[in-house]
Amino acid sequence: MGQLIHTFTVEDTEQIIPKVKEDYGDKALIITNKQIRPKTLNRSALYEVMVAIEESDYEEHLKKQGKSLPAKKSSPKPSSTSLAEEKIRSQIPQEDEDVVLDFSNTRLNTNLNTVKNNDLAKKTYQDFPQNKINPHQNKTLGFDDFKEKLSEVSNEISKVTNTPLENYTPNPNYNKKIENFEKQFEKQINKLNDKIDLLADMMWDDKAEARKNLMIPPEFASIYKQAKESGMLENHLEAIMKATIENMPAAMKTNKDAVQRYFHSLLRNILPCRVESDIKKQKIMMLVGPTGVGKTTTLAKLAFRYAYGDKRYKTGIITLDTYRIGAVEQLFQYAKMMKLPIIDSIEPKDLDEAIKSLNNCEVILVDTIGNSQYDQSKLAKTKEFLMHSNAEIDVNLVVSANTKHEDLMEIYKNFSFLNIDTLIITKFDETKVFGNIFSLVYETNIPLSFFSIGQEVPDDLEVANSDFLVHCILEGFNKGKNNE
């Protein structure tokens, strides 16, 4: 009885052992396995496996499965595109073919897994020696011939199998096929995009009446949709789109990317932001606004920014809020943690005294009581504090980004008698639309000073930036992305 050598292919290395056990039994020996086809977008990888088994063991395994030993036949001429694979396949039978090796007079005591690794990194498939295998040799070998041939073949196969990927020389025809496929795929995608654009233009023209006779070219459809979904007022959007269409150079109007850039630029110019400059004389900032917009938390963030930022100004705090015990205690706790002086002023006449006691501070932050924009008595009390002070006080109206436009305008109108200098917008992380903020600034023309973008003290505070706000208006707020 002789020894048989079989080859077969699988698409996954995890299939090798189960297939060997199923087809050849537990006594089969895996000589080697190698990848003969890399994985691509539309095809799985392919691995070739060589196994050896005694003919008697193979017959016994087949009997258990109710099968008989296949007839011996010569292997067909291979059609592999790799020179090394052609030579190996001329010696190694194809899938499900048997080779009988004559060991009748001699014992074989060798390890079929022996691998030599000399010059491993230098070997490619094309380096396989042509004199290693005689494609016309009879498949029945004597022991000496078999030992020599099998040793050489195993060595070369092992070198090919273990060749590093970076040293592998792919078949040029295969690369050309992939390149042609990519070109065809790109053409199909471009055709599909053209069809989508055509359909979008047709739908855009059909809906012209719904835009109140606002003649907007299809190239402006995307930016129009973004702006409309942001929540800005319809009349504001109409005015901006008209300005864009009328003033934009004709050569740019057919380019969607150019339209996007121009529209972004126009919005940035509409949104005034106060430039943060070095403090050369004492700066007093009073924060006013309705209940629940985050004035106290924002003041704590500002205190840390001025006291421990790049410039490190001497900073003090005054609170006029004696109604909300919890808020006052919270502010005192913040001041204690930051080691900043803090004074509470109960009566309007006491404000100037409090400011004088913090005369050594370069920045003084004043917290006020939060109240409804409709509570005229408390609003009048805040106005009284300002009237009794001779100091130059910068009044900052704090409003929340998640407040609808109608309420924002009510808040501004009822606080405007305090002579608002800037707007501070809070709670960026609690809304997805910012067109309401745009419309507020568009109507009031009050500059923006700071954005509170989250609840973390002191980190979630940004100096107002029109580019940042425009990005939020058109694309939404993403804390990890917008403030990079």
UniProtKB/Swiss-Prot annotation:
<keyword id="KW-0547">Nucleotide-binding</keyword>
<dbReference type="GO" id="GO:0015031">
    <property type="term" value="P:protein transport"/>
</dbReference>
<keyword id="KW-0813">Transport</keyword>
<dbReference type="GO" id="GO:0003924">
    <property type="term" value="F:GTPase activity"/>
</dbReference>
<dbReference type="InterPro" id="IPR000897">
    <property type="entry name" value="SRP54_GTPase_dom"/>
</dbReference>
<dbReference type="GO" id="GO:0044781">
    <property type="term" value="P:bacterial-type flagellum organization"/>
</dbReference>
<dbReference type="InterPro" id="IPR047040">
    <property type="entry name" value="FlhF__GTPase_dom"/>
</dbReference>
<protein>
    <recommendedName>
        <fullName>Flagellar biosynthesis protein FlhF</fullName>
    </recommendedName>
</protein>
<keyword id="KW-1005">Bacterial flagellum biogenesis</keyword>
<dbReference type="InterPro" id="IPR020006">
    <property type="entry name" value="FlhF"/>
</dbReference>
<keyword id="KW-1003">Cell membrane</keyword>
<keyword id="KW-0653">Protein transport</keyword>
<dbReference type="GO" id="GO:0005886">
    <property type="term" value="C:plasma membrane"/>
</dbReference>
<dbReference type="InterPro" id="IPR027417">
    <property type="entry name" value="P-loop_NTPase"/>
</dbReference>
<dbReference type="Pfam" id="PF00448">
    <property type="entry name" value="SRP54"/>
</dbReference>
<keyword id="KW-0342">GTP-binding</keyword>
<feature type="compositionally biased region" description="Low complexity">
    <location>
        <begin position="67"/>
        <end position="83"/>
    </location>
</feature>
<dbReference type="GO" id="GO:0016887">
    <property type="term" value="F:ATP hydrolysis activity"/>
</dbReference>
<feature type="binding site">
    <location>
        <begin position="426"/>
        <end position="429"/>
    </location>
    <ligand>
        <name>GTP</name>
    </ligand>
</feature>
<feature type="binding site">
    <location>
        <begin position="289"/>
        <end position="296"/>
    </location>
    <ligand>
        <name>GTP</name>
    </ligand>
</feature>
<dbReference type="GO" id="GO:0006614">
    <property type="term" value="P:SRP-dependent cotranslational protein targeting to membrane"/>
</dbReference>
<keyword id="KW-0472">Membrane</keyword>
<feature type="region of interest" description="Disordered">
    <location>
        <begin position="64"/>
        <end position="91"/>
    </location>
</feature>
<dbReference type="GO" id="GO:0005525">
    <property type="term" value="F:GTP binding"/>
</dbReference>
<feature type="binding site">
    <location>
        <begin position="367"/>
        <end position="371"/>
    </location>
    <ligand>
        <name>GTP</name>
    </ligand>
</feature>
<dbReference type="InterPro" id="IPR003593">
    <property type="entry name" value="AAA+_ATPase"/>
</dbReference>
<keyword id="KW-1006">Bacterial flagellum protein export</keyword>
<comment type="similarity">
    <text>Belongs to the GTP-binding SRP family.</text>
</comment>
<comment type="function">
    <text>Necessary for flagellar biosynthesis. May be involved in translocation of the flagellum.</text>
</comment>
<dbReference type="GO" id="GO:0005047">
    <property type="term" value="F:signal recognition particle binding"/>
</dbReference>
